[in-house]
Structures are given as C-alpha cells and as structure tokens.
C-alpha cells in the first residue's frame, strides 16, 4: 500500500483531487502504513493549509428539550439523558463567557442552541447578543442555531456572524439510522442558505456511531461537493440515557486514519478536532495534529467537559505548531 499512498501524495501536490475509488483503497490500509498515511496528510496540510492552528469555543446558550431525535444527543426530548434544560442564557453571562474564552486564547466564539431551529421572534434576542459580542470583543463570531432560512441567516450575518455551523453528522446512507425527525436534504438546504447569506459554513460530523469507514469517506466527499471550508470532527461520547450509550468506540488508529483521509479529500479545509477526542483517543489525542488536523474546539463542549484551553495550547506548542494570534 506504500505505493498508492506515495502516488496519492504526488498527485495532490501536482494539483489533482482525490477520487472516491482511491480513497476507498486508502481506507483499507492497516498497520504501519497508517503512520505513512498520517505523515502524507501532515505534509498536505502544511502545503495547502493556513499555517496556523485555529481555536474556536462555544457556549451552550439554550439547552435540552429538543424536538429532534438524534440518537447521539443528550439534549433530545425523546431520550432519557440527565441534562440541564434552560431557555436562552442571560446576555451578560454569554458575553462574560466570550470574554473569558478570548482571554484564554480562543479565536472564535459561537452560541449553540438546542432545538430544530428558531422562529423570527426567538432569533431577535440572539441577534442582540451577537451585536454586543461584535462591539465588546475581537472574536470572530460563529453560530449554531439549527435549521434556519436564508432571510434569518442574512440577519445573523448583518449582526456580525461570519461562520455558520451546521453538521451533516454522517453520510447520506447512514443518516436515517441516527435521525428521523428531519432529513439530510434539510441539513444541506440550511448549509446552502448560509452560504447564500455570505457566511462561511462549518460542517462535519461524528465518528464512531456505528458507521463504516466508507460512510465516513462518503461524508467527506459530500462536504467537498458543498465547498465546506471548516470541518469539525467529533468522536462519539456515549452518554447514558441516549440510544447510543452502549455503542463501542472505534480504535484510536482507525480515528487517526479517518482524519488523515479527510485531509487528503479536503486538502485546503480546516480539519477541526471537536468533542469526544479526549475519551476516544486517550493518550493519542495529540496525534490528529500529526495526521492533518489544523483547528480545534477548545474548552467545554455542549453537555460534556473538555480539557482546559491552556492544556490544548501547550499541546500544540509541544508539537511545534503555530497558534493564531498567539
């Protein structure tokens, strides 16, 4: 398999794009060849990427009681997970959280809200918060508010939001096995609406929900077709009370191989390590940044805790990587 890895590297540096057939062959590599694939992915990142690691942060601005039945999610009203439920947080609390994350080294900040989407009335106080964040911080502003229409997304852009987060979560084939209350095409429609509104879209998914590596590859090609420039990679954190609470995690090397493949399929996109990396990768959690990743979600996640921002920044510096603005 060394030959196909090297041929792929040469083709990418010559300006070709990875095709689905070759990606499928690379997905079958095992053993020490995985390390070769990771090294090639690192070189591809260094050649096509921005040269610095981008750090984003979030606040769980509205939690629980979600109408959707995503099988991985603790916030779904369909499941029995023990999770805090509250409406939109006080604006001062959100702005305070943003200031803390900015001081600790984050470059981006996003409100994340539970629920299918937002009505125009529900969106109004959120817009006011973003206008405050634009005035009172230097953070790049992101939003993750579910399924919205283009008019709503344009209002977010006018309030200062430059990036909209809306995951595909899985491949088209596998998606119906994790969610039945909305469709894959509805997610794609929101992504296209955000792009039409002038925002960059951040979209990826979750590994280790029971999908195959071919499902992961198919999602990467879907993301490429959509022109996605920031790809968050989450790894399932099985939460008690959700349908996936007993789902076995894929091995760390399988995760690293998948990350490397994403870099080869999406050579110039941000590959952003997000939730679940601590538990799934264990002692190998620095290695995604050797396998092609160049961004990270830092601080706490939605319903689980991450490492401290300082720990992640130190890890990146120990790897010899540059961090934006630091």
Curated annotation (Swiss-Prot):
Top-level EC class as recorded in UniProt: transferase
SMART domains attached to this UniProt entry: BATS, Elp3
EC number: 2.8.1.6
Annotated residues for binding of [4Fe-4S] cluster: 66, 70, 73
Cofactor(s) listed: [4Fe-4S] cluster; [2Fe-2S] cluster
Keywords, alphabetical: 2Fe-2S, 4Fe-4S, Biotin biosynthesis, Iron, Iron-sulfur, Metal-binding, S-adenosyl-L-methionine, Transferase
Positions with a binding annotation for [2Fe-2S] cluster: 110, 142, 202, 272
Membrane-crossing residue ranges in chain numbering: none
GO biological process: biotin biosynthetic process
Pfam families named among the record's database cross-references: BATS, Radical_SAM
Single GO molecular function: biotin synthase activity
Free-text function comment from the UniProt entry: Catalyzes the conversion of dethiobiotin (DTB) to biotin by the insertion of a sulfur atom into dethiobiotin via a radical-based mechanism.
Subunit-level organization: Homodimer.
Xref: NCBIfam families: bioB (TIGR00433)
Protein name: Biotin synthase
Organism of derivation: Heliobacterium modesticaldum (strain ATCC 51547 / Ice1)
Source taxonomy: Bacteria, Bacillati, Bacillota, Clostridia, Eubacteriales
């Amino acid at each position: 398999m060394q030959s196909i890895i090297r041929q792929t590297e040469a083709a990418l540096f010559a300006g070709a794009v990875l095709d689905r057939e070759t990606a499928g062959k690379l997905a079958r590599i095992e053993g020490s060849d995985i390390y070769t694939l990771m090294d090639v992915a690192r070189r591809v990142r260094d050649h096509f990427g921005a040269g610095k690691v981008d750090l984003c942060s979030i606040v769980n601005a509205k939690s629980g009681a979600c109408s959707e039945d995503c099988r991985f999610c603790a916030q779904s009203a369909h499941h029995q997970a023990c999770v805090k439920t509250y409406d939109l947080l006080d604006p001062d609390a959100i702005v305070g959280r943003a200031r803390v994350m900015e001081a600790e080294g984050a470059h981006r900040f996003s409100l994340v809200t539970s629920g299918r989407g937002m009505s125009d009335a529900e969106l109004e106080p959120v817009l006011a918060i973003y206008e405050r964040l634009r005035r009172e911080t230097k953070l790049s502003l992101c939003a993750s508010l579910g399924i919205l229409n283009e008019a709503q997304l344009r209002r977010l852009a006018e309030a200062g939001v430059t990036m909209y987060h809306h995951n595909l979560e899985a491949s088209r084939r596998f998606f119906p096995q994790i969610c039945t209350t909305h469709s894959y095409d509805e997610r794609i429609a929101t992504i296209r609406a955000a792009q039409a509104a002038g925002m960059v879209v951040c979209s990826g998914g979750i590994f280790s929900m029971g999908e195959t590596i071919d499902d992961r590859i198919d999602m990467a090609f879907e993301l490429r077709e959509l022109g996605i420039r920031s790809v968050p990679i989450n790894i399932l954190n099985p939460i008690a009370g959700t349908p996936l609470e007993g789902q076995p995690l894929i091995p760390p090397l399988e995760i690293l191989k998948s990350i490397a493949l994403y870099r080869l399929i999406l050579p110039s996109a941000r590959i952003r390590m997000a939730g679940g990396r601590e538990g799934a990768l264990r002692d190998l959690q620095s290695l995604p940044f050797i396998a092609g990743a160049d961004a990270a979600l830092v601080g706490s996640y939605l319903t689980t805790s991450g490492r401290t921002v300082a720990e992640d920044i130190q890890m990146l510096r120990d790897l010899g990587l540059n961090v934006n603005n630091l």
